[in-house]
Amino acid sequence: MRIKMFAKIAVFTLVISAVFSYCKNNQGVSGVTGWKYNDPAGTDFVVKQGLITQIPMGMVAIEGGSFTMGEKAEFVTQPRDNRQRRITVSSFYMDQYEISNVDWREYSNWMKVVFGKSAPDLVKRSVPNVNTWREQLAYNEPYLQNYFSHPSFNQYPIVGVTWEQAVDYCAWRTDRVNELALIKAGVIKAPNFASLDSMPYDSIRLKFIFSTQKYLLQNSYLPEPGRNARKKGAQLSPKVDMSDGIMYSDYRLPTEAEWEFAAYAITSDKNDIVAEGKIYPWAGQQTRLTDRRNMGRIQANYVRGRGDMGTSGIANDRATITGPVNSYMPNDFGLYNMSGNVNEWVLDVYRPSSFDDVAEYNSFRGNVYVKNKVDSKDSFGREVFEIDSLGRIAFETTEDLRNFKDPDPQAKIPLDTMDISDVLRPVIDERSRIFKGGSWKDRVYWLNPSTRRYLDQGMSANDIGFRCAMSMIGDIPQTKRRR
């Protein structure tokens, strides 16, 4: 009996070894046609093998799942615009910290270097509105003069930026990250910024500026090839595409569902039991730490009460206005300041009834479907796309779904009409964007990640910032999988 058992084990081992050997020897061969991958003598169909998923710099990988989105506490003077709803979000990445002043100054500096001489009006689009610090009955001029520009505030969150500016920043970040990835891979050469002094504006936007979509879709756009540029016959072509695994997906603002899911950081215990119903991004019903070492310390930057900042040396939240983006303890996903410090823009259009209307999976209101603008066709019949003022492919709207299934009559009020029902709030329309999280000037109620407010996408405030997100391509990088 024992000999038979050993024989079976030996046969099984040989079969497994043969399977692994076959797979190893046929990694470069199509499993459906038998033709070789990555064969220059053939069609040169490139298949990236052994790709290890890289987490984008400064981001945290968040595994998606289902959770109960919506109100966790009731406030009688606030409208019930966040009724509970069970939804599911897919896996994504999110910035560990809020975008800081130094992050934004990098963006502003790039815009100034590239467009400062040829198109100075474009540079103004990257400048935050420092006037948001002004209040009629407060002396905030030092913040107006220094908050954005002084190195002492480098790691403080950027404020005074509109939703539109935040979206532009995400697009700029996508292009800069992908440009650097191609440079490091030796596919293209680094841009020569010194050449901008004598370069006309059209050459800058058409040829000098790297844009991810322009690189992928515009056949006439050919950056200078790098040391590892791919050869095709006698021609040196630096072009790669997303299948090469070098470039990243688009940076963007998180959807409201993603932001709330990330803020609560709902995880299971060792028995795979998930406890929902958290009020804040941390455990418990209080805003103070309860562990012995940090007992009594406040866990977020907010206003506890009028005239209740604390006294010199023992300020209750250790911040007068905003605080550094790495202040306080992170939540269970490793994200900092998901409550307090500054409110954060999300991608969604605001509607009081959104929770009743949106889809169960990847809930979102605000879809605007677009297509690239075609300028002409080249001699091969390929489409030549129009390039916009920032050097990106221009697009046109094909379908606007921001008001899709919208029962709210306020959404149909003209922009120049005042909402007489509540003069303290802006009119609700397709430009109303949600911000969440609470800030340095908010009371504790707004620290609940389920609370939501809105502002016109072209307006800014000294307590609203943002962080970026990115859809995850493939599986989440995991060191430990569930049983």
Where are the regions that the model predicts?
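Bacterial Sec-dependent N-terminal signal peptides
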Residues: M1-T33
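Disulfide-stabilized, aromatic/cysteine-rich ligand-recognition loop
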Residues: C23-D44, K48-G50, F75, S149-P157, ...
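Active-site microenvironments of metalloenzymes and redox enzymes
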Residues: K24, F92-R292, G296-R297, L347-S353, ...
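A short, compositionally biased domain-edge/stem linker segment
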Residues: P40-I55, K232-D241
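Mature N-terminal segment immediately following signal peptide/propeptide cleavage
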Residues: Q54-E71
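Extracytoplasmic
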Residues: M57, G64, Q84, V89-S91, ...
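Short loop/turn microsegments at loop-to-beta-strand junctions
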Residues: M57, S249-D250, M329-F333
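C-terminal, low-complexity/hydrophilic appendages and adjacent surface loops
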Residues: T77-N82
